């Protein structure tokens, strides 16, 4: 009464006939044409995602500016939390100098490339 080890060894006392039915929830991906076309489409989408277009120059420059502002913000936090009691004007001027030095460093590295 069992099929491939599935089912009851004996239907006696189980209140069933012991008949084993095929699971309708199981689908064979290789035989179902709807699923194979979906898989092909998914593979094509993954391949298209791997081939990325050239990034826009404005996006790259914006990310670089954000990175610079992050460094300046961390520097400002360090100055504000430091043991020296600096005024806001002094901190602002030091942050501006730091920002200019970073920008000059970036321009020099671009001119070398």
Swiss-Prot record:
GO biological process terms, alphabetically, are: mRNA processing; RNA splicing
The residue ranges of the CWF21 domain are 60-105
Q: Which residues cross the membrane?
A: none
Among Gene3D superfamilies, the record links this protein to: 6.10.140.420
Q: Where in the cell is it found?
A: Cytoplasm; Nucleus
Which portions of the sequence form the region Disordered? 1-61
Coiled-coil stretches are none
Renumbered to this chain, the Low complexity biased-composition regions fall at 43-52
Q: Where is the composition biased (Basic and acidic residues)?
A: 29-42
The UniProt record lists the keyword Cytoplasm: yes
Record function comment: Involved in pre-mRNA splicing. May function at or prior to the first catalytic step of splicing at the catalytic center of the spliceosome. May do so by stabilizing the catalytic center or the position of the RNA substrate.
Family assignment from sequence similarity: Belongs to the CWC21 family.
Q: What is the name of this protein?
A: Pre-mRNA-splicing factor CWC21
């Amino acid at each position: 009464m069992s099929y491939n080890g599935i089912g009851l060894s004996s239907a006696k006392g189980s209140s069933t006939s012991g008949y084993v039915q095929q699971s309708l929830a199981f689908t064979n991906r290789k035989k179902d044409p709807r699923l194979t076309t979906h898989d092909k489409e998914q593979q094509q989408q993954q391949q298209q995602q791997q081939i990325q277009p050239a990034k826009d120059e404005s996006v790259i420059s914006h990310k670089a500016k954000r990175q610079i502002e992050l460094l300046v913000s961390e520097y400002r936090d360090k100055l504000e939390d430091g043991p020296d009691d600096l005024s806001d004007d002094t901190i602002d001027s030091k942050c501006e100098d730091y920002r200019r030095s970073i920008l000059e460093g970036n321009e020099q590295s671009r001119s070398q490339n």
